[in-house]
Amino acid sequence: MSNRTYADNLFPQQVAEQHEEQMSSGSSPKSNSPSRSISSVEAANSRIHIGWMATTLDVAENLDRHVATFCTRLGEFKYNFVVYPIGGVVRAFWTPNGSAENHPPVIDLPDVQLRNDLWESYVVGKISPWIDCDSSDPAFASLSEEHLLKELSYICYLGLQTMAIELTRISSPRTAAILKKWIWTRNSRFTVWVQLPSAIEKCKDYDAFTIEHVDLWTIWADFRKNCGNFSGVYFQVALTISSELPDELTELKLVDRWKAEPLAAFVIESGLFISGRNGEASIPSAHINLLKHLWTTDALRIVLRATTDTFKYNTSIKSEYSQALRHAVRNVNYRSRPDVGEGSNDSTHYLNVIEYKDVLQAPLQPLSENLDSGVYNTFEQDQIKYDVYGEAVVGALKDLGADGRKTVVIYLLGGGRGPIGTKILKSEREYNNTFRQGQESLKVKLYIVEKNPNAIVTLKYMNVRTWKRRVTIIESDMRSLPGIAKDRGFEQPDIIVSELLGSFGDNELSPECLDGVTGFLKPTTISIPQKYTSYVKPIMSTHIHQTIKAQSIPYLSRAIPSHGRGEPELDEDEMWIQKYPQGHVRNNMDQIYVVYLSKYIPLAETTKPVFTFEHPNFMNSSNERSDSIEFVMDRNADLMGFAGYFDLQLYKTVMLSIEPSTHTPGMVSWFPAVIPLRDQLRVGEGDRISLKIDRKVDNTGVWYEWHVEKKKTNGESVSTPIQNPNGESYYMRM
């Protein structure tokens, strides 16, 4: 007697055995042998999930009581799941006729015909398509609301993990209001797929004469907003793809918007398939390109919806559909990954940046907080950055050494655990080998200034073990260096070297730190870096916006200091607590973050510069700044904020950059900064947006304040609130 379950029947036994054999043997998937090709196909069968949507064409007698058999047959055709009407097909495909006696059939989809775990894993419950809560007929709208609630309740009863609801209108405020209340107030966490029509012209309320600036994306974005912008983990969108692709699914800048949305699935209509060379079902190239472009992860789902009854008399067509769909996308996600295997020198190999995708990180504040060994260790993995620093030091030594001098005094300001110190001493050797052969060597006299007492332990060890006691180590805040140097009789520097930059350039207070040593410098002292500039670019990312807004503070972390001006204090119970008078959500949204951006798109082709600082600052120029940066929007979108970058001129033409167009190849020391808005701002094609940003300074710290002004094409202006006033949420202490 067989011990196989329904789940096992989704794939033939031999496939599972082949997969187990491959996994146990540990064989490489790179072989091009026929057996490996078969294995890759079977791996795609389990890795890429293709579902079948039950339609009127599937209706058979007592189908609602034979769901297990229906699913098992689909499994034989390589379908991993089914999208099935939650009330059953009899109820789902009922046709209202306007009669008062005409009532929809009751929900009649018995739960005991499948194990609970199979309902959860293999069935997506679809809301009956006749339900229209936004109908112009008040009675039918009310009836629809009543039965939508019944079907939502039954989804919870069955314990389904996912449900689908198909929008048939451009505007569905009443449907959104019902869903909004349900998802926000019920303790039920199923995922909602909001299925869009294949084209805006398919909407019941479409009117070519009155509809302007509306497309499929705006239908989704408005519905998402009307549902309270619920978490994209549980509230997602499904695109319907038919034979005719609308312009917004062929024009790249419009297609890209879906990369910034919680895209869950593609509903593929069978009518788009064509006959291939051998007569098998094939997908047109335009549709393949669309799927590949949006296939950012194998967690996406594809659903086949039959629009013709071909599958009833062509028994192989179902398999051909699923095979063609898997073939279209099976290698996309793998090909897009960088090769970081054996022999690769890609920096991402050892930093594992993939783990940081879309993870929010607070910018470091090394001036007010001492870094730990693990942070230093992470920095030190990026050899490319240190190599470029070495190149800059060699360039400066070449210029200074041209007069034949024997000694150059270098101060490393902020030594950390010493990697730049090591690079400076190697640069001395490189300079002498290149430019002083047959002459007296140039000697670097190196001082390292570091305020972190813990890192001083490492620096002293390095001085004995690696640097042969050549370095003078000064344990001090660099801003105290002029006084210390005067007391101890230290020489003035010919070169100062520092690495004090954050993801937005000056946001780790490099200007304030370096200004503190200006009085100790010679008029000819070279600073490495000489100049740095921050840049911004508007971005769209529903995921990042929701992630920032949803942050919460665990009870045991409630006294951890905020990133703002406020400090922890004792409450009435003598317990330490960090208070947020501005509110937790506003506190979250009024900060700058560091993020390895993935689920986002830029809304401008190029960045624009913001703040520039040059060193040494002999003119004692103020470090306060104010700027207005304007961008013209080229599509309808939701602006969530700005990505921030910087570049720095280390010495003359030697540069480091994370600005996208000039990014230093292979360097991963800095991820982009994100400057969020409190709420996503809807922008239209042709709108002008201006980021107004100030860098403010007082006696104890530095902060940014920012807001956006939007000018629409009709001249109407909108301004967002000023964020982070007086540094209440994000304050960089000096």
Swiss-Prot record:
PROSITE patterns: SAM_MT_PRMT. It is an enzyme of class 2 (transferase). Residues 541-589 are annotated as: Dimerization. It catalyses: L-arginyl-[protein] + 2 S-adenosyl-L-methionine = N(omega),N(omega)'-dimethyl-L-arginyl-[protein] + 2 S-adenosyl-L-homocysteine + 2 H(+). The keyword Zinc does not apply. Residues 1-39 are annotated as: Disordered. It comes from the Eukaryota. GO terms for cellular component: cytosol; nucleus; transcription repressor complex. Changing residue 379 to Y: Abolishes catalytic activity. Keywords: Apoptosis, Chromatin regulator, DNA damage, Methyltransferase, Nucleus, S-adenosyl-L-methionine, Transcription, Transcription regulation, Transferase. Homodimer. Interacts with cep-1 (via C-terminus domain); does not methylate cep-1. Interacts with cbp-1 (via N-terminus domain and HAT domain); the interaction results in methylation of cbp-1. Component of a complex that contains cep-1 and cbp-1. May interact with pid-2, pid-4 and pid-5. This is Protein arginine N-methyltransferase 5. The lineage of its organism: Eukaryota, Metazoa, Ecdysozoa, Nematoda, Chromadorea.
